[in-house]
Curated annotation (Swiss-Prot):
Glycans are attached at N95, N163, N190, N229, N314, N401, N563, N658, N670, N708. Residues 45-522 form the Sema domain. Keywords: Developmental protein, Differentiation, Disulfide bond, Glycoprotein, Immunoglobulin domain, Neurogenesis, Secreted, Signal. GO terms for cellular component: cytosol; endomembrane system; extracellular region; plasma membrane. It comes from Drosophila melanogaster (Fruit fly). Disulfide bonds join C118-C129, C291-C399, C315-C358, C525-C541, C535-C550, C590-C647. Belongs to the semaphorin family. Transiently expressed by a single large muscle during motoneuron outgrowth and synapse formation. Ligand for transmembrane receptor PlexB. Plays a role in growth cone guidance. Required for both proper adult behavior and survival. Can function as a selective target-derived signal that inhibits the formation of specific synaptic terminal arbors. Function in neurons is essential for adult survival, motor neuron survival, and is important for climbing behavior and activity. During embryogenesis, plays an important role in correct salivary gland positioning. Disruption phenotype: RNAi-mediated knockdown in the neurons of adult males, reduces survival to 77 percent. Adult survival begins to decrease from approximately day 9 post eclosion. Pan-neuronal or glutamatergic neuron-specific RNAi-mediated knockdown decreases adult climbing behavior. Glutamatergic neuron-specific RNAi-mediated knockdown also increases activity, at least during the light cycle and results in a significant loss of motor neurons in each thoracic cluster (T1, T2, T3). GO terms for molecular function: chemorepellent activity; semaphorin receptor binding. It is found in: Secreted. The lineage of its organism: Eukaryota, Metazoa, Ecdysozoa, Arthropoda, Hexapoda. This is Semaphorin-2A. Residues 1-25 form the signal peptide.
């Protein structure tokens, strides 16, 4: 039978073979070792094909799209206060799902007149002309709350009880009502505020804020409210603010955080870099500080800060030409550790997108503020450090008992020299973590101490603009800081994470987006990992090799966060035995879907055979094929392919298969799997025929171009006849 006569039969059989799924042809790969349980999205349970996914570690609070963008946590009261559109919610820290949208809330809607005025200025009635709560701070040991909202582009502040009820008229708080310079006009503007009860002039409490102080956004300000003696209902100290319309002090800043530490209040923000303006436009990240006892100058700077200083924050990849992440997006400080700040940075959105996490030590910050000042002698000159001999005494920016007694030379100097020369460098010469094509929005940090092992881990939870959380662990080995990505999980797909908080008492992470709030247990363990390899690298978890499960860490469990013991999980790796038919193609794999955190890791397959011993598999299109999930396809198995196949990630064993080849090629089939094996062999044979057919057709096409164009030439002639 010729190849041409066989082609209809080939076409039919090849069509049948191509309609068979890969899992039918490679029937052995219907079972895998690893899968990653879903984490935090609402439909996880319905889509989980690998066992029931308990949702007890993920809880949600949702009262509609209310722009949940402000958190204030009070662990003593087991409460998370949430600022939203026209509302403040009181959410149960233990279980946010138990909170009620109608009961645990106070409504703070703007008046009709405020809304009408807002709309008349061209603002949206359904978003802009609402009261978006942007500041919630505890007062009086948490008995009362200070609240400030945009109030239809007419900022307004309130003092309410911690149970979300209004104060009676008899408890009116003087100085409260007008929220200008305390929170923004525009709900989309970044701002920060912190209520400071100790260390201020006269020991009086007051709010420190960083925000826009005008509807037009022309006046940005770092501000402290008037300080009142509440018992006497008397103003003791007037407000203090940055110099108005002076780009050396502030130039279009975006504020991201503020902190009360010792004698100072620190502010973190990004702004247009005045020192770079002669070379073009750039945005730099800053840290600024003011003394809490600052009362301004006597004649100069009477209503302004007399101790205001700022310095650049440097988050960059080190090198001869460092790569800078110039735009700070968020900052966090552990309540138990005032010596460090952790922050997320991004590149400019106009160029190559990238994000990084950097940490800063208070000693490096103090060194920058104690260093040289920077100045520009004329509008066309470069910015240069100021000689120490030109710095007046007492040193500008130093906290003194009464700043109104500072000499004019000091006040004049600080008025024109608020910028420090030295940047604040991040720790360890490199970011904790960085990644391109990613926008980090918020972060929180946890610290885990295992005393018996004398080991400390810092765990970063970093939110993105697409609703994902990157979980990163940092640890020290021989004095060197090391960090690695542990996990990536989706919390709110395609929603930007707007705010985050973490509770040590409840061991929970809280995430806010415009649509919802979610609570996630820090120790997910068996609800996230089904295998030893992933489990032992999470500092919250440990592998129980007796029960073959992942549990919250205890001393008798396996754990290897630093990956120092590559074979720690070898005894826990499941090993599968497979019998395959001669000529069969078999698919071996460890993952149903490879976790994203492992996609860039090197996966290596090894074959242990009788003839060659142990050797590394080299991929080839005719024998060994790598799948998209790092699995291995062995094509057309023969006796030499028998033996053990091990899959390694780095030095760690992930999974193992022991293959036995059935050399009796004509064994009568006795079950459905045997029929599938034979059918797979036929498909393999017809693939060979298909290849031969294509080769024949190609040669036929080449021959047809050589045919004689004369009408009397025989179609089968291979030589051209000479013309007669």
């Amino acid at each position: 039978m010729s190849l041409l006569q066989l082609s209809p039969l080939l076409a039919l059989l090849l069509l049948l073979c191509s309609s068979v799924s890969e899992t039918a042809a490679d029937y052995e790969n219907t079972w895998n070792f690893y899968y990653e349980r879903p984490c935090c999205t609402g439909n996880d349970q319905g889509n989980n094909n690998y066992g029931k996914h308990g949702a007890d570690h993920v809880r949600e609070f949702n009262c509609g799209k209310l722009y949940y963008r402000t958190f204030h946590m009070n662990e003593d009261r087991d409460t998370l206060y949430v600022g939203a559109m026209d509302r403040v919610f009181r959410v149960n820290l233990q279980n946010i799902s138990s909170s009620n949208c109608n009961r645990d809330v106070i409504n703070l809607e703007p008046t009709r007149d405020d809304v009408v005025s807002c709309v008349s200025k061209g603002k949206s009635q359904i978003f802009d002309c609402k009261n978006h709560v942007r500041v919630i701070q505890s007062m009086d040991q948490g008995d009362r709350l200070y609240v400030c909202g945009t109030n239809a582009h007419n900022p307004k502040d309130y003092v309410i009880y911690a149970n979300l009820t209004h104060l009676p008229r008899s408890e009116y708080v003087i100085g409260v009502g007008l929220g200008i310079a305390k929170c923004p006009y525009d709900p989309l503007d970044n701002s920060t505020a912190i209520y400071v009860e100790n260390g201020n002039p006269g020991g009086l409490p007051g709010l420190y804020s960083g925000t826009n102080a005008e509807f037009t956004k022309a006046d940005t300000v770092i501000f402290r409210t008037d300080l009142y003696n509440t018992s006497a209902k008397r103003l003791e100290y007037k407000f203090k603010r940055t110099l108005k319309y002076d780009s050396k002090w502030l130039d279009k800043p975006n504020f991201v955080g503020s902190f009360d530490i010792g004698e100072y209040v620190y502010f973190f923000f990004r702004e247009t870099a005045v020192e770079y303006i002669n070379c073009g436009k750039a945005v730099y990240s800053r840290i600024a500080r003011v003394c809490k006892k600052d009362v301004g100058g006597k004649n100069l700077l009477a209503h302004n800060w007399a101790t205001y200083l700022k310095a650049r924050l440097n988050c960059s990849i080190s090198g001869e030409f460092p790569f800078y992440f110039n735009e700070i997006q968020s900052v966090y400080q552990l309540p138990s550790d005032k010596s460090r700040f952790f922050a997320t940075f991004t590149t400019s959105t106009n160029g190559l997108i990238g994000s990084a996490v950097c940490s800063f030590h208070i000693n490096e910050i103090q060194a920058a503020f104690n260093g040289k000042f920077k100045e520009q002698s004329s509008s066309n000159s470069a910015w240069l450090p100021v000689l120490n001999s030109r710095v007046p005494e007492p040193r500008p920016g130093t906290c003194v008992n009464d700043t109104s007694n500072l000499p004019d030379t000091v006040l004049n100097f600080i008025r024109s020299h608020p910028l420090m020369d030295k940047a604040v460098n991040h720790e360890h010469n490199n970011p904790v973590y960085y990644k391109r094509d990613l926008v980090f929005t918020k972060l929180v940090v946890d610290k885990i101490r295992i005393d018996i092992l004398n080991q400390e881990y810092i765990v970063y939870y970093v939110g993105t603009n697409l609703g994902r959380i990157y979980k990163i662990v940092q640890y020290y080995r021989n004095g060197e800081s090391l960090s690695k990505l542990l996990d990536i999980f989706e919390v709110a797909p395609n929603e930007a994470i707007q705010v985050m908080e973490i509770s040590q008492t409840r061991k929970s992470l809280y995430i806010g987006t415009d649509h919802r709030i979610k609570q996630i247990d820090l120790a997910m363990c068996n609800r996230r990992y089904d295998n030893c390899f992933r489990c032992v690298r999470d500092p919250y978890c440990g592998w129980d090799k007796e029960a073959n499960t992942c549990r919250p860490y205890e001393l008798d469990l396996l754990q290897d966060v630093a990956n120092e013991t590559s074979d720690i999980c070898d005894s826990s790796v499941l090993k599968k035995k497979i019998v395959v038919t001669y000529g069969q193609s078999v698919h071996l794999g460890c993952f149903v879907k490879i976790p994203e955190v492992l996609k860039n890791e090197q996966v290596t397959w090894y074959h242990h055979s009788k003839d060659k011993g142990r050797y590394e598999i080299r991929y080839s299109p005719t024998k060994y094929i790598e799948t998209t999930e790092r699995g291995l396809v062995v094509v057309s198995v023969n006796e030499a392919d028998g033996g053990r196949y091990d899959c390694h990630l780095g030095g760690s064993l992930l999974c193992s298969y022991n293959i036995t080849v059935d050399a009796h090629r004509c064994t009568p089939p006795n079950k459905s799997n045997d029929y599938q094996k034979i059918y797979s062999d036929w498909c393999h044979e017809f693939e060979k025929y298909k290849t031969a057919m294509k080769s024949w057709e190609k040669k036929q096409a080449q021959c047809s171009t050589r045919q004689n164009f004369s009408s009397n030439q025989h179609p089968n002639e291979i030589f051209r006849k000479p013309n007669v």
